[in-house]
Amino acid sequence: ALKRQDKMHLKEAAALLGVSEMTIRRDLQGNDAPVTLLGGYIVLEPRGVAVSRYLLSDEQTRLVEEKRHAAALAASLARPHQTLFFDCGTTTPWIIDALDDALPFTGICYSLNTFLALQEKPHCRVILCGGEFHASNAIFKPLNFQETLRNLCPDIAFFSAAGVHPRYGATCFNLDELPVKHWALEMAQRHVIVADHSKFGQVRPACMGPLEAFDTLATDRMPDEAFIAWAQAANVSVMW
């Protein structure tokens, strides 16, 4: 079935095979087959591409409840009829999941798993920014910012980060993500970074920007006193 349509919803696959959704999730995690689970869909990975398992497998099943907690806090900031930008990563789909299905909004994204999550929201107008596809983190890197992104000013930008550090700022693993992240920092009216506790104190290779550039940080537990003191001095609100 996947050879015909490239993707299939998890529920549809479970019904087709006569097994539970949990069984399929478990089998995909322990299988080297050229398929992966993104936003509730089983997706064929691109042929001829050596895909990193960081986004697609390892991180997707790591600290899930912590990510969901932080994501729900971030989702509470959204209001009807706003334009919302969603970063790539494995935390941002949980933000979308936490949004009320009755909420009307416009969702901007540039990653496949985030797009698949947004299309499940019945009152969401989805804008997927196209470009060169990078299978390692499932993003579309824009070839021309003037085509779409420069025409958009989100009310809120929700960012994910692999590292959160008062001195070195918010960081991630992939340099290819930076152009869109930097656009969102420049054009969005409010900047919200969503990161579970394991990201604090970490520094990754690609710098998104200083933490002072973000208005709000949503996480799953109270940071240490030194970080809270820094956040108060920097006028960054922290939710946990």
Identify the meaning behind each predicted range.
Residues 87-88, 196:
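Short His-Asn-centered micro-motif
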